[in-house]
């Protein structure tokens, strides 16, 4: 039986600001990308999210970011690579400690937003992220993988460093012909119809391709499928994807 992981971003509330319906999504997905306080989330929310994920048997990943609360991590920051490495280590260490308190572990790392897109091609920043993961793995005996865009430079560097890699596709995002994501600033970058998105995911998993924004077919490999938790109708979207995969005989299972 074919299997695939379904992941979603969670723990993105902080202080009095609330985002997403994490509790509902945890009943649907198999992996949770938990914000680590740099683009969203705080100590309380991180704890609540890890506890709930553990109770639902959902795999926990660290959703690390540039230090950009004001911009929700969507702004590129030309940060010194050494500082970026240390800030990723900081985020990983915080989430690992909080997860451990709730009887869980952090199994993978998924960079967020602008950082995610930048390390597809930015040598110095991609290297810094890989070094951070490898440093924590080496110091603690952990075996965290990195989850990223297929063909991304960061995945190549991770493999060279001996860090496990996982590739993902986005259920509700449009793709360019080169396999990169269409900028959110461009019209049509985010898909909103649950039925359309669900069919698209089945094609991705069974045929290994996605239709780009210009209509061309792009070969793409996916260990995991991301459904965004902060978009309108996120729960309905995730439910439609899960149900359509199940009806096709595809089993949902955490990749990490």
From Swiss-Prot:
Its EC number is 3.5.2.9. GO terms for biological process: carbohydrate metabolic process. It is an enzyme of class 3 (hydrolase). Keywords: ATP-binding, Hydrolase, Nucleotide-binding. The keyword ATP-binding applies. Gene3D superfamilies: Glycoside hydrolase/deacetylase. It catalyses: 5-oxo-L-proline + ATP + 2 H2O = L-glutamate + ADP + phosphate + H(+). GO terms for molecular function: 5-oxoprolinase (ATP-hydrolyzing) activity; ATP binding. SUPFAM superfamilies: Glycoside hydrolase/deacetylase (SSF88713). Forms a complex composed of PxpA, PxpB and PxpC. PANTHER family: 5-OXOPROLINASE SUBUNIT A, UNCHARACTERIZED PROTEIN YBGL-RELATED. Belongs to the LamB/PxpA family. Catalyzes the cleavage of 5-oxoproline to form L-glutamate coupled to the hydrolysis of ATP to ADP and inorganic phosphate. This is 5-oxoprolinase subunit A. The gene is pxpA.
């Amino acid at each position: 039986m074919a299997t695939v992981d379904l992941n979603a971003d969670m723990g993105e509330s902080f202080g009095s600001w609330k985002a997403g319906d994490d509790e509902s999504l945890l009943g649907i997905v198999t992996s949770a990308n938990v914000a680590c306080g740099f683009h969203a989330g705080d100590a309380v929310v991180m704890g609540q999210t890890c506890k709930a994920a553990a109770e639902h048997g959902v795999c926990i990943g660290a959703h690390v970011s540039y230090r950009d609360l004001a911009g929700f991590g969507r702004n590129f920051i030309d940060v010194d690579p050494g500082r970026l490495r240390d800030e990723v280590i900081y985020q990983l260490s915080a989430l690992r400690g909080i997860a451990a308190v709730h009887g869980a572990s952090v199994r993978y790392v998924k960079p967020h937003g602008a950082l995610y897109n930048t390390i597809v091609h930015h040598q110095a920043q991609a290297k810094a992220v890989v070094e951070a993961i490898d440093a924590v793995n080496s110091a603690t005996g952990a075996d965290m993988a990195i989850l990223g865009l297929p063909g991304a430079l960061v995945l190549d560097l991770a493999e060279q460093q001996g860090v496990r890699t996982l590739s993902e596709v986005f259920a509700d995002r449009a793709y360019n012909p080169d396999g990169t994501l269409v900028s959110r600033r461009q019209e049509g970058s985010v898909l909103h119809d649950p039925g359309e998105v669900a069919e698209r995911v089945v094609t991705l998993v069974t045929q290994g391709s996605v239709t780009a924004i210009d209509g061309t077919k792009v070969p793409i490999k996916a260990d995991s499928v991301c459904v965004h938790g902060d978009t309108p109708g996120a729960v309905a979207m995730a439910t439609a994807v899960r149900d359509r995969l199940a009806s096709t005989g595809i089993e949902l299972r955490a990749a990490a």
